[in-house]
Amino acid sequence: MSVTRGHKSTPSLLLLFLSVLTSLLAAIPVLQANAPSAGPGVRILRPPESTVAPSGDEVVFVCETSLPPEHFEWSYASTRSHAPRFKYLKSSSAKNNSNITITNDNDISKLRVIVRPETLGEYRCVAWFGPLAVTSTTARLELATISGDKIAQRSNWRVAAGNTVLWQCGQVVSNPAPTWSFYYNDIEMPAASTLSDSSGTLLLPHVSTASSGTYTCVATNTASGQRLAMPRRLELQVPSAALPSAAPALLPGQSVRTEVLARIGETVLLLCPGVGYPPPTAVWSSPDVTGAVYNNRTRVLPYGLQIGGLQPKDTGTYICYLDNGIRPALEHYIQLVVQQAPRIVRPPSANLTNEGEFMVLECAATGTPTPKIYWLLNGENSVYDTESELPANGSLILRRVQKRHAGCVQCFARNVLGEDSAGTLLQVNPTQIQAGDGMGTGGMGRSSNRNAHNRKQKQMVPPSAPNVTRLSDESVMLRWHVVKNDGLHIQFFKVQYRMTDSGKRKSWQTTNENIPYGKQRHDSDEAVRNFTSSVTGLRPDHSYRFRIMAVYSNNDNKESNTSGKFFLQRGAALAPLPVPELLDIKEYSQTAVMLHWHLPSDADEQLISGYYAYYRPSASAGEYLKATIDGAKARSALISALEPGTIYEFKLQSFSAMAASEFSSLKQGRTQRPRSSTTAQPTMHTVDTTTPTHNETFNMNPLLTGTISGGALLILLVISACLCLCKRRHSRGDNSQNKPRLAELREDFVPLNTCSPNKPRTRHIHITLNPLAQQQQQQLQQQHQQDEKDSQDNELGYFQRQPVVYDAETLGFNGLARMSSSSLRRSQRTLERAAAGGGSGGNNNNLNQATDASLAASLDSPRLQASNKPGRVILKRSRLSSRSENLSSGSLNSVGV
């Protein structure tokens, strides 16, 4: 096989260029970026985290991936712009910018930023794996600030002993949230006196005269360490004497927080301020939350309700009822909102789609506040794509899928608490460009003629670039396709690969296996034909590139586009994939079976991209054939191109971009056996009103078919019976009318008499053995003739002479011995009795004992008996043996008829 390539036309180069744009490495499921996942595949293990820092500090953003990418990039959007758009920070610009430094080390990239007003904003990490870009969640860089009230305010409270005092020091705006320090008579108080909220509330439970004094506070920014002394002051007086009774009420300037925001899992304290005399007690209730007060997570305090381990169901309205027995009681209504970071509950899912088709990708997320959903296509926001549309439900609509959409599509859900992301691989099958498409009609005449000549020749349409999936530490699985085309037929494929991470460029290695194309033409409804093959003998922890070489019917070849760089990682670094379980294998046709399987859990669908099916005849020990089943949601698949009536063994394997699962258990299935009977089997057919062509076969009703077949069989039986009967009669007629060897029979038979139904039968046989009995014999003959005339019997009979057997000892060897007179007389009497019995219809067995069986059958024939023609009754002479031949000239004097 020659691998030398000839001249390529401009359409072929254009086809190659378009194929490069749409070639994909593998299905890369992008899992949640804000938490490491146990699933396999390429993902962001550690995304950059948001940071608040003072001006001039150095901040380091760290991004770590599960596999080393080809290269890292960082994108940045400034918060100073009204509509920020992310831009890539190029390495060259980073070197020239002293505020930004990028360092990459295998699978970790670090971005060092000096906090300046121009560097504040959002940052993303982008890991490139060939043409695919996996983007991290957003990290914000914010400046540490703190500010508060500047108006001095003094509060004078007079409270009866035993009450609980709650004082808010003031309102501050701080990023991050500040810490508070309280002072009593300019002496710092223990931290336990401060409640754990950002409003700076001072708690003084069960005040006494010792609690009287002056109180102040200071707020401190935890990031910058900046302290802010609040101008508010509290003068508290607790008299020792009893005060008059009073209903519960708020102190002057005291406020109630009617809305409390807290994160899920935290502990929150709902305050119920108010004093009275005697000191009131608080009673809590909630009309929205059933059992919200009295459970193992709540605690009722004199000054509030404490709820631990917040859950979304704790959101609602809480009512505090302060009562000391004096009316009116004091009520506070507090709204608790449990906030939750966004979490994607329905990630997007996409498979191979054709260029120009309409596509909808869905993504659903939960969170409080309701998260906002946006999409990235290979790191670029979908709002800048002219073919995309974002409806209110958060899905992504691609009105016409383009080649630029191929790659990693990610859905991001975002609210004030953070972000979550999930992604899928979108594969785009480009529109096939045939030779001569898009070429103008103008130009020189010679060029036009050359182009017209080129258009008449069939082109070598190359296969697509292979998708690569890891199978083991030393093998990968390649998947590619060939679009339906009118080009030259492909005979077989070859796989080529080379290592790319070594310093010296290595040559392409070619596998020994010839991968057959199969049928030379696509099926009518098959737009794309998929192929699968494995490559073994690779080295782990190295990068490879792959390509497919197609050999055509003209014995020339053409290679596909090269795959992206694929890093073959050791299996120890990858988490195992779910193993599918084969449930059933059903007969589908004589050449196909249907596989049915399931996964241990439907949640495992997010970890895989599809399945590999392996099969071979159970009686064979050869290599397994392979088939690829795209889509993690698939639970059945049709395996075709099998042999009729053959038992096959099957096993399945799930796969993702970077790994494959263990094999499922083997299971056997059989294709349908060929039909050995011509009886039509009842099948379901759709109604077709079109006229069938000459090569189409009608499917008749089984009842009608059986009726016609039975009638035809009955007619054949009747005809056969008639033919057999006629043949039998004809055979009997031939036996009676056309007797063979007539001349010989005349010599051996003696005519008895003519026979006619209208004439009396005269049977007379006289055998005179000696002259002495001749006279007596004549008298017997006359009497016999008279009896024959009276009987008028029309029956026909044949009488054969009974041969006389003589003893050899009496006759001697030469047969010349003379018989005694007594023996002759006994013979005479025997014959006379026989003759008399034959004439009167008596027993004639002695005379007819040696009659030929065939002759007797002829006599009994109705055809012969009914004949009106005169017949001859002949009696066959019995031939004597050599021992009795002397009788003719001896004692036997005459035989008369």
Swiss-Prot record:
Residues 434-468, 666-694, 773-793, 819-849 are annotated as: Disordered. Disulfide bonds join 63-125, 169-217, 272-320, 363-411. One of its GO terms (molecular function) is protein homodimerization activity. Residues 40-147, 148-235, 244-336, 342-429 form the Ig-like C2-type domain. Heparin binds at residues 498, 504, 506, 545. Glycans are attached at residues 96, 99, 296, 351, 393, 467, 530, 561, 695. Pfam families: fn3 (PF00041), ig (PF00047), Ig_3 (PF13927). The chain crosses the membrane at residues 703-723. Residues 666-682 have a biased composition (Polar residues). Residues 683-694, 774-784 have a biased composition (Low complexity). The keyword Transcription does not apply. It is a single-pass type I membrane protein. InterPro entries: FN3_dom (IPR003961), FN3_sf (IPR036116), Ig-like_dom (IPR007110), Ig-like_dom_sf (IPR036179), Ig-like_fold (IPR013783), Ig_sub (IPR003599), Ig_sub2 (IPR003598), Immunoglobulin_dom (IPR013151). Residues 462-571, 579-674 form the Fibronectin type-III domain. GO terms for biological process: axon guidance; compound eye development; cuticle pattern formation; homotypic cell-cell adhesion; maintenance of protein location in extracellular region; segment specification; smoothened signaling pathway; wing disc anterior/posterior pattern formation. It comes from the Eukaryota. It is found in: Membrane. Keywords: Disulfide bond, Glycoprotein, Heparin-binding, Immunoglobulin domain, Membrane, Proteoglycan, Repeat, Signal, Transmembrane, Transmembrane helix. GO terms for cellular component: axon; cell surface; cytoneme; membrane; plasma membrane. Residues 724-897 are cytoplasmic. Mediates response to the active Hedgehog (Hh) protein signal in embryos, functioning upstream or at the level of patched (ptc). Homodimer. Heterotetramer; 2 iHog chains bind 2 hh chains when facilitated by heparin, heparin is required to promote high-affinity interactions between hh and iHog. The first fibronectin type-III domain mediates a specific interaction with Hh protein, in vitro. The second fibronectin type-III domain is additionally required for in vivo signaling activity. Belongs to the immunoglobulin superfamily. IHOG family. This is Interference hedgehog. It comes from Drosophila mojavensis (Fruit fly).
